[in-house]
A protein has these predicted regions:
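Catalytic, metal-anchored helix/loop core of enzyme active sites in primary metabolism
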Residues: 45-132
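A conserved regulatory-domain signal marking ACT and ACT-like small-molecule sensing domains
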Residues: 96-194
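Substrate-binding/catalytic subdomain of NAD(P)-dependent oxidoreductase enzymes
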Residues: 1-61, 66-68, 87
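Residue-identity detector for glycine
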Residues: 11, 23, 68, 73, ...
Protein backbone atom coordinates (compact mmCIF):
# COMPACT_ATOMS: atom_id res chain seq x y z
CA UNK A 1 0.00 0.00 0.00
CA UNK A 2 1.22 3.49 -0.88
CA UNK A 3 -0.49 6.49 0.70
CA UNK A 4 -2.05 8.72 -1.99
CA UNK A 5 -0.13 11.79 -0.80
CA UNK A 6 3.15 9.99 -1.61
CA UNK A 7 2.17 9.58 -5.27
CA UNK A 8 2.84 12.40 -7.73
CA UNK A 9 -0.35 13.34 -9.55
CA UNK A 10 -0.76 16.20 -12.00
CA UNK A 11 -3.79 16.74 -14.21
CA UNK A 12 -4.67 18.47 -17.45
CA UNK A 13 -6.78 21.34 -16.11
CA UNK A 14 -4.08 23.89 -17.03
CA UNK A 15 -3.47 22.69 -20.59
CA UNK A 16 -3.21 25.58 -23.03
CA UNK A 17 -3.46 26.02 -26.80
CA UNK A 18 0.32 26.41 -26.94
CA UNK A 19 0.77 22.93 -25.40
CA UNK A 20 -1.52 21.38 -28.01
CA UNK A 21 0.30 23.23 -30.81
CA UNK A 22 3.64 21.99 -29.48
CA UNK A 23 2.33 18.41 -29.42
CA UNK A 24 1.02 18.67 -32.99
CA UNK A 25 4.37 20.02 -34.19
CA UNK A 26 6.05 16.96 -32.67
CA UNK A 27 3.39 14.56 -34.08
CA UNK A 28 2.33 13.39 -30.61
CA UNK A 29 -0.83 13.61 -28.50
CA UNK A 30 -1.16 14.65 -24.88
CA UNK A 31 -2.81 11.97 -22.74
CA UNK A 32 -3.31 11.76 -18.99
CA UNK A 33 -1.38 8.59 -18.10
CA UNK A 34 -1.25 6.68 -14.83
CA UNK A 35 1.77 4.39 -14.53
CA UNK A 36 2.82 1.68 -12.10
CA UNK A 37 6.22 0.38 -13.12
CA UNK A 38 8.66 -2.16 -11.79
CA UNK A 39 11.93 -0.22 -11.61
CA UNK A 40 13.99 -3.17 -10.33
CA UNK A 41 13.43 -6.44 -8.47
CA UNK A 42 13.38 -4.43 -5.23
CA UNK A 43 11.54 -1.26 -6.30
CA UNK A 44 8.49 0.04 -8.14
CA UNK A 45 7.16 3.51 -8.79
CA UNK A 46 3.86 5.08 -9.77
CA UNK A 47 2.59 8.45 -10.87
CA UNK A 48 -0.17 10.16 -12.84
CA UNK A 49 0.96 12.84 -15.26
CA UNK A 50 0.08 14.13 -18.72
CA UNK A 51 2.35 12.53 -21.28
CA UNK A 52 3.39 13.14 -24.88
CA UNK A 53 2.32 9.91 -26.58
CA UNK A 54 3.73 8.85 -29.96
CA UNK A 55 1.64 7.13 -32.67
CA UNK A 56 3.45 3.84 -31.99
CA UNK A 57 1.95 3.57 -28.49
CA UNK A 58 -1.29 1.67 -27.92
CA UNK A 59 -2.92 4.54 -26.02
CA UNK A 60 -2.34 7.03 -28.84
CA UNK A 61 -5.73 6.14 -30.36
CA UNK A 62 -7.68 6.20 -27.08
CA UNK A 63 -9.91 9.28 -27.21
CA UNK A 64 -13.05 10.82 -25.74
CA UNK A 65 -14.68 8.84 -22.91
CA UNK A 66 -12.61 5.73 -23.59
CA UNK A 67 -9.82 4.41 -21.40
CA UNK A 68 -6.94 2.15 -22.29
CA UNK A 69 -4.80 -0.04 -20.07
CA UNK A 70 -1.52 -1.62 -21.09
CA UNK A 71 -0.26 -4.49 -18.93
CA UNK A 72 3.17 -5.95 -19.42
CA UNK A 73 4.11 -9.29 -17.92
CA UNK A 74 7.06 -11.65 -18.00
CA UNK A 75 5.10 -14.52 -19.56
CA UNK A 76 2.77 -12.71 -21.94
CA UNK A 77 4.63 -9.55 -23.02
CA UNK A 78 1.91 -6.89 -23.45
CA UNK A 79 -1.87 -6.84 -23.23
CA UNK A 80 -4.02 -3.87 -24.15
CA UNK A 81 -7.54 -3.37 -22.80
CA UNK A 82 -9.78 -0.70 -24.24
CA UNK A 83 -13.30 0.42 -23.37
CA UNK A 84 -15.59 3.13 -22.16
CA UNK A 85 -14.47 4.53 -18.86
CA UNK A 86 -16.68 7.57 -18.48
CA UNK A 87 -20.29 8.46 -19.04
CA UNK A 88 -23.52 7.38 -17.40
CA UNK A 89 -23.63 3.70 -18.46
CA UNK A 90 -20.01 2.71 -17.69
CA UNK A 91 -20.18 4.54 -14.35
CA UNK A 92 -23.53 2.96 -13.45
CA UNK A 93 -22.19 -0.48 -14.38
CA UNK A 94 -19.16 -0.04 -12.12
CA UNK A 95 -21.27 1.17 -9.21
CA UNK A 96 -23.74 -1.70 -9.63
CA UNK A 97 -20.88 -4.20 -9.75
CA UNK A 98 -19.40 -2.76 -6.53
CA UNK A 99 -22.80 -2.86 -4.78
CA UNK A 100 -23.41 -6.48 -5.81
CA UNK A 101 -19.93 -7.51 -4.67
CA UNK A 102 -20.53 -5.85 -1.31
CA UNK A 103 -23.97 -7.43 -0.87
CA UNK A 104 -22.55 -10.89 -1.60
CA UNK A 105 -19.47 -10.37 0.62
CA UNK A 106 -17.18 -10.87 -2.35
CA UNK A 107 -13.54 -10.11 -1.63
CA UNK A 108 -10.53 -10.31 -3.87
CA UNK A 109 -7.91 -12.83 -2.88
CA UNK A 110 -4.25 -11.95 -2.96
CA UNK A 111 -2.71 -15.40 -2.55
CA UNK A 112 0.67 -14.48 -4.02
CA UNK A 113 1.01 -11.64 -1.54
CA UNK A 114 1.82 -14.07 1.27
CA UNK A 115 4.82 -15.72 -0.34
CA UNK A 116 6.28 -13.10 -2.66
CA UNK A 117 8.71 -10.42 -1.60
CA UNK A 118 6.99 -7.05 -1.74
CA UNK A 119 9.00 -4.42 -3.62
CA UNK A 120 9.48 -1.00 -2.04
CA UNK A 121 7.98 2.16 -3.49
CA UNK A 122 10.53 4.66 -4.81
CA UNK A 123 10.48 8.14 -6.29
CA UNK A 124 14.20 8.00 -6.99
CA UNK A 125 13.88 8.01 -10.78
CA UNK A 126 14.54 10.62 -13.44
CA UNK A 127 11.83 11.87 -15.76
CA UNK A 128 12.20 14.09 -18.79
CA UNK A 129 9.47 16.72 -18.58
CA UNK A 130 8.02 19.61 -20.54
CA UNK A 131 6.99 22.51 -18.28
CA UNK A 132 5.05 25.37 -19.86
CA UNK A 133 4.51 28.53 -17.83
CA UNK A 134 3.81 32.23 -18.22
CA UNK A 135 4.60 34.03 -14.98
CA UNK A 136 5.45 31.38 -12.37
CA UNK A 137 9.19 31.21 -11.63
CA UNK A 138 9.58 27.57 -12.65
CA UNK A 139 13.39 27.72 -12.53
CA UNK A 140 13.18 29.07 -8.97
CA UNK A 141 10.92 26.18 -7.93
CA UNK A 142 12.31 23.14 -9.76
CA UNK A 143 15.86 21.83 -9.67
CA UNK A 144 16.42 20.27 -13.08
CA UNK A 145 19.40 17.92 -13.29
CA UNK A 146 19.72 18.82 -16.97
CA UNK A 147 17.97 21.35 -19.22
CA UNK A 148 17.59 20.16 -22.82
CA UNK A 149 15.63 23.05 -24.30
CA UNK A 150 14.14 26.43 -23.33
CA UNK A 151 11.78 28.78 -25.12
CA UNK A 152 10.52 32.20 -24.08
CA UNK A 153 7.93 34.50 -25.64
CA UNK A 154 5.37 37.07 -24.55
CA UNK A 155 2.54 34.51 -24.53
CA UNK A 156 4.21 31.52 -22.91
CA UNK A 157 7.52 29.92 -22.02
CA UNK A 158 8.60 26.33 -21.68
CA UNK A 159 11.52 24.29 -20.50
CA UNK A 160 12.32 20.65 -21.23
CA UNK A 161 14.57 19.03 -18.69
CA UNK A 162 15.45 16.02 -16.58
CA UNK A 163 14.15 15.99 -13.03
CA UNK A 164 13.81 13.54 -10.16
CA UNK A 165 10.28 12.31 -9.47
CA UNK A 166 10.97 13.02 -5.78
CA UNK A 167 11.61 16.68 -6.69
CA UNK A 168 8.26 16.94 -8.50
CA UNK A 169 6.50 15.34 -5.53
CA UNK A 170 8.14 17.73 -3.06
CA UNK A 171 7.27 20.81 -5.15
CA UNK A 172 3.86 19.81 -6.54
CA UNK A 173 1.88 22.33 -4.48
CA UNK A 174 4.03 25.16 -5.83
CA UNK A 175 3.35 23.96 -9.40
CA UNK A 176 -0.42 24.15 -9.03
CA UNK A 177 -0.57 27.67 -10.49
CA UNK A 178 -3.04 28.18 -13.30
CA UNK A 179 -0.26 29.19 -15.68
CA UNK A 180 1.84 26.00 -15.30
CA UNK A 181 1.41 22.82 -17.35
CA UNK A 182 3.61 19.77 -16.96
CA UNK A 183 3.94 16.73 -19.24
CA UNK A 184 6.16 13.66 -19.23
CA UNK A 185 8.35 12.98 -22.26
CA UNK A 186 8.94 9.24 -21.87
CA UNK A 187 12.59 8.30 -21.58
CA UNK A 188 12.75 6.29 -18.37
CA UNK A 189 9.88 4.04 -19.46
CA UNK A 190 10.71 4.11 -23.17
CA UNK A 191 9.45 1.08 -25.09
CA UNK A 192 7.44 -0.17 -22.11
CA UNK A 193 4.17 -0.42 -24.06
CA UNK A 194 4.70 -0.26 -27.83
Amino acid sequence: YVAPEKIFTYGISTIHDSDIRYAREKNVKIKLVAQVVKVSDEHFTMFVIPEFVTPSKYIYSVDDEYNGVVIRGECYDRQFMFGKGAGSLPTASSILSDIMARLNNYRYEYKKQNYMQKPDYTTDITLKVYVRYKETDVHGILNFTKVHEQYTSEDSNYVIGDIQLSELLAKRDRLRGKDVFLANIPIFFLNRDN
